[in-house]
A protein has these predicted regions:
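Glycan-recognition and catalytic regions of carbohydrate-active enzymes
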Residues: 68, 99-124
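Glycan-recognition surfaces
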Residues: 5, 9-103
Length: 124
């Protein structure tokens, strides 16, 4: 992290150990975010599972340091629009990194509207 800071440029440093090694206990000394879960899958049961696991460590997050339940699956086609809305809201309420995981060149207008929801982004 110190080497990245010396560049003088803002850099978001994300750690990924797939939720192992109790990364939520030490991640904020090294990075800005750390994965608390296994890879998310493009299905509702995976979204809920990752949210519940991520929610076990709220004390680890703070300004400039976030628990990361993995990227957003909004726009990838495996969720209904209601599930996509819920997925985005859960990540926003959890203060999770809102990392878009779909192809923005092909995403539907409805899914893009979810990703651009200013109210949820403001909560996040």
């Amino acid at each position: 992290r110190d080497a990245l800071a010396k560049t003088g440029r803002p850099i978001y440093y994300s750690l990924c150990s797939w939720g192992t090694d109790s990364v939520w206990e030490w991640g904020n000394t090294t990075g800005n975010s750390w994965r608390t879960t296994n890879d998310i899958r493009n299905e509702w049961v995976s979204v809920v599972s990752n949210y519940k696991i991520n929610d076990q460590h709220p004390e680890s997050a703070g300004p400039g340091a976030w628990n990361d339940p993995d990227m957003l699956e909004v726009g990838n086609g495996g969720l209904t629009l209601a599930e996509e809305r819920s997925h985005f809201a859960l990540w926003a309420f959890a203060k999770a990194p809102l990392i878009i995981g779909c192809d923005l060149n092909t995403v539907s207008k409805d899914s893009l509207a979810i990703l651009k929801n200013k109210n949820l982004i403001a909560i996040n």
